[in-house]
From Swiss-Prot:
One of its GO terms (biological process) is O antigen biosynthetic process. This is dTDP-glucose 4,6-dehydratase. Its cofactor is NAD(+). Homodimer. Pathway: Carbohydrate biosynthesis; dTDP-L-rhamnose biosynthesis; Bacterial outer membrane biogenesis; LPS O-antigen biosynthesis. Binds 1 NAD(+) per subunit. It comes from Xanthomonas campestris pv. campestris (strain B100). The lineage of its organism: Bacteria, Pseudomonadati, Pseudomonadota, Gammaproteobacteria, Lysobacterales. The keyword Thylakoid does not apply. It holds the Pfam family GDP_Man_Dehyd. Substrate binds at residues 84, 133, 187, 197-198, 213-215, 222, 257, 289-293. InterPro entries: dTDP_Gluc_deHydtase, NAD(P)-bd_dom, NAD(P)-bd_dom_sf. NAD(+) binds at residues 12-13, 32-35, 58-59, 80-84, 99, 158-162, 188. Belongs to the NAD(P)-dependent epimerase/dehydratase family. dTDP-glucose dehydratase subfamily.
């Protein structure tokens, strides 16, 4: 049985990845600091499962990471741990530098030392996979897509911190020979998503009868990737990716933000109509745009398709229907989040 050390495995993408990995017979050591977006309720179905070992801790704690590596002897380390919300990075960039840059460095140092001491056969097979974002590339005009050779041009404190972490991973490969892989993904959506992000925020506010905030004119474009497609892409890169390479992961589903909100409203009108009969779109409220808001992201994932045979299984229409249905049938999970410190408020609106 393979063993993977997964960092950030109680978050949105990491949590979905851990659930799928354990179901596929992987033994997972899950290291998560359980900051505001980490949620053990996401992993409730794994309680008592011997193949899931949860450890509360920070990737910046080199001694802890070293102990876990020595104790569990993983065949791969997958780094999902990150502060990831652009609005929060505008309000408080320091936490993003600490986790995404300093934390990644500490993790890399511990993993490098562990990898160097492995027997030859295990050392050759070992992989460090770093999960990153398309936001490191900056913004696009009306045409074109990000490729793996697009120059980095991050525009927010969040994307700058992720760009720095990507560069550290690359440097540890070229300097020390660490067998790394990097994935840069587009906007994810799906189950277990913390409701500060657009899709779960709109669902929660719509059900609460609150205004649905749309930044600026709502015509910012994002490529939307269903989270289970992303998890499959990561497993594919881990199994077949070329060491030292970067792979873009996209859903081939470009949508304006306002189109996403309208799609959610239509699904809620169908499955959970308002008592007064009004359409959910009547709750849409245009608000001041995010400072420095990137206009358009679009991913060219042809390298991943051509080299490794991966492509998304879900269209946006399929994925958003599954997502809305999940939130409607899992309100206990949502309420558990909203009973904490987060109350669907906007942050990072001013500089």
């Amino acid at each position: 049985m393979a063993t993977w050390l997964v960092t950030g495995g109680a978050g949105f993408i990491g949590g979905n990845f851990v659930l799928e990995a354990v179901s596929r017979g992987i033994r997972v050591v899950n290291l998560d600091a359980l900051t505001y977006a980490g949620n053990l309720n996401t992993l409730a179905s794994l309680e008592g499962n011997a193949d899931h070992i949860f450890v509360k801790g920070d990737i910046g704690d080199g001694a802890l990471v070293t102990r876990l590596l020595q104790e569990h002897q993983p065949d791969a380390v997958l780094n999902f741990a990150a502060e990831s919300h652009v609005d929060r990075s505008i309000e408080g960039p320091g936490a993003f530098i600490q986790t995404n840059v300093v934390g990644t460095l500490a993790l890399l140092e511990a993993v490098r030392d562990y990898w160097k001491a492995l027997p030859d056969t295990r050392r050759d097979a070992f992989r460090f996979l770093h999960v990153s974002t398309d936001e490191v590339y900056g913004t696009l005009g009306e045409t074109g897509k990000f490729t793996e050779t697009t120059p980095y041009a991050p525009n927010s404190p969040y994307s700058a911190s992720k760009a720095a972490s990507d560069h550290l991973v690359r440097a540890f490969h070229h300097t020390y020979g660490l067998p790394v892989l990097t994935t840069n993904c587009s906007n994810n959506y799906g189950p277990y998503h913390f409701p500060e992000k657009l899709i779960p925020l709109v669902i929660a506010k719509a059900l609460a009868g609150e205004p649905l905030p749309v930044y600026g004119d709502g015509k910012q474009v994002r490529d939307w990737l269903f989270v289970s497609d992303h998890c499959e892409a990561i497993r594919t890169v881990l199994a077949k990716g070329r060491v030292g390479e970067t792979y873009n992961v996209g859903g081939n589903s470009e949508r304006q933000n306002i189109e996403v909100v309208q799609a959610i409203c239509a699904l809620l009108d169908q499955h959970r109509p308002r008592e007064d009969g009004k359409p959910r779109e009547s709750q849409i409220a245009y608000v001041t745009d995010r400072p420095g808001h990137d206009r358009r992201y679009a991913i060219d994932a042809s390298k991943l398709k051509d080299e490794l045979g991966w492509e998304p299984a879900y269209t946006f229409e399929q994925g958003i229907a599954l997502t809305v249905d999940w939130y409607l049938t899992n309100q206990t999970w949502v309420q558990g989040v909203l009973d904490g410190s987060y109350r669907l408020e906007r942050i990072g609106a001013t500089v």
